[in-house]
């Protein structure tokens, strides 16, 4: 069972001028935006730094001075890319990282300048911040969340400065941002988009799916989901998807390092698992039973509870003082948080039970 690192060992010494860009390259560059390069990559197109140089500089920094990564495998990938003739010479530029709690925005992107004269715009998925997670949940009732608008602005600004063709991509929320930005970009920009890679990213509201830009890009959208996908089936999708085999189980299949690779392609599975299909039906049934206002109230109540203490990340939630603060807030319940959450969770349980009865003899 080969993975991304096996792919780099096999194909890493062959430049893209000899072996064309493929979906596995798209996933690798999508993951790259999870690395917090901080000031190593310029915020504009003046003086791009090579991927190899950026990686070497980043990895040479003392542990306490390195920017964050999503997981240790991201650093391992960065080290492998620095040694690869296929990736090391590529330019990095136009880095943007915006975290604005008061706007409930978590957004980051980086441009990778490919050796064929095109660029790959990589959008970061959700990080560990509660702000980022709340923004994701808000996609269930907003036609556009702040990060989606930021992604569109990013693509438009980059395209105004860069004359070549474009590829867009991301993992998880990053894949959603790539599709959103491509679909709503001006037609002169859309015409330059060669492909968009959505790696297990959530879907959209009908406003986006019915837009002329989305419909126009359908043949250029490449959506990949693992067998037990949950995130990649959220909300609505009109584009076809490819089901990828993973070495993990359940929700852990969202990890792109678990996806199986063969040559320059992913190893395909025939279909998603029954568990994935049932989870999708339960969530969609639950959301269908809630008005946009009810969804908004549920999300606000949930994250008000989670942030009752000093928690700002998912890891903070497990600290005793933050758990105690959340429990006190739930017990106090002056603002009706407990009732809102209880009603929402009861409806979710009913939806899940209905799906179970329909699918399990």
For each feature predicted by the language model, list its residue ranges:
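Alpha/beta hydrolase fold serine-hydrolase catalytic domain that processes acyl esters and thioesters
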Residues: 1-24, 29-110, 114-119, 123-138, ...
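Gly/Ala-rich beta-loop-alpha elbow adjacent to hydrolase catalytic centers
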Residues: 169-174, 178
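Short glycine-enriched nucleophile-adjacent loop
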Residues: 178-187
